[in-house]
Amino acid sequence: MVRMEPRGLTSQEETENDDGDFRLRRRHPLTFSMPPLFLLLLLSSIHASAADDICIVGSGISGSSTAFFLTNYTAPISAQLRVFERRDRVGGRLATVSVAGDTFEAGGSVIHPRNLHVRRFADLLGLAARDDGEGDDDWLGIWDGARFVFSTLPPPPPGSSWLRRRLHALLNSLLLLRRYGLSLFRMDSFAQEMLKKFLLYYNDFESRPVFDNVEDMLKWSGLYGLTQRTLEEELIDAGLNSQTISELVTVITRINYGQSVSISGLAGAVSLAGSESGLWAIKGGNWQLAAGLLKTANATLHLQEGIDSISDAGDYYVLKSNKGHEYNCTVTVVATPLDEVNITFTPPVSIPPRKMQHTHATFVRGLLNPKFFGLSSVSDIPELIGTMELPDIPFSSISVLKKRNQHDMTYKVFSRAKLDDSLLAQIFSTREETIRIDWPAYPHYHAPEDFAPIILDGKHLYYVNSFESAASAMETGAVAAENVARLIISRLPLGLRASPLLSSEKRCRWSS
């Protein structure tokens, strides 16, 4: 993790890298031709910054991607790139949790095979795919609060032959087909049509405009209409039957977005795509993507320093932090949802009201209680329990993260509200360790969606997370960040890099 803090007004800056080593980074020499009193005042405020700084608020995938694209697409610039993070770690909603010595994803968990930016980031940073099998649950049970209305087959024993595993997959496909019929293919076609349009955001620069508002960005790709109707409306028009929507589709949206099929169509389509095969994650945690991008961008990272206010000072913005420091920035990028952070803007900015959907992730080392599910044995409980949209069901999903033996497992429970100990005592027969995390994970989607501006003030105050009202995922954050970086470059005299690390030509090759 990069940790860089200003240590004084010198011509060099000492910085710490991931290994705890220090290096010297050359900065522009300072020429002192000012009155001594002014010089003393300047030296007494070592956290004041030059007015040509570019500042990013938030170190999650949106903020780190913005930093990366800005430095990757431009020639070396004299501006200092600062990234502010109010927590003590980078990654935003990408984080891990440790249970019994094992590490699991606590936030954004999976990456789709056609998430082309994130794929390239991982390759560029030398990050390996996780190989521990988390997220590979294929024993699905759909619970209605009283019984399992549908279940796939239990997985074959470890070490089973290729033929047995293929036969198992075939039988599960037949079970799904028997229950849901042609709606399975229509559901897949709906998700694939969305992905086909989304892939347009990887086109080369000559055929892909820079967008200054989300509406035009979505209309250009043909995705805007999906944000104006509910997922349920879209799927009915696509020919899906009511059983598929109320069971299978609902399970997927409750797991991925903690919401029902009344979410907007684009968010729903992204959710359906997130249930496909081939999903993967970064070994050691997806947060490493953000950390690596910030390091590659040579960003000055201010950990545990949140921004309290952003004021327009004419040719630059004054950012005041919760540590009492001020930073002068010609460009300011807000890369965190403004819905639950208290940043004061002067003059005020106007964005549509938006609620964030909180997902409570509860990690439990212990054993599920089969009687709670109307079963006689733990071995009868599916490894992924999805739930229907019914008022008396207290959780969205339960999944097995690791099975040490028949009496010792680690589970992840998603719910819309905190699960208290009395309820957990009913769901689990034993609990050795319990960890609770409350995430303002994504917007509460509704149709028609209304979008905040990308440019908040008509000048150089940008908001990456405005795109999140269309859909929220690691890749959508990266796509929105690339557009903001290109927008900044198009509006400032920044020279383009001759051979960026992430070129549009390479992106085209990935999609083939």
Spans of model-derived segments:
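C-terminal segments that line or cap access tunnels to active or ligand-binding sites in enzymes
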Residues: 329-331, 336-497, 505-510
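Active-site/ligand-binding neighborhood in enzyme catalytic cores
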Residues: 181-316
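Glycine-rich FAD pyrophosphate-binding loop
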Residues: 71-99
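Beta1/beta-strand and adjacent pyrophosphate-binding region of the FAD-binding site
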Residues: 49-62
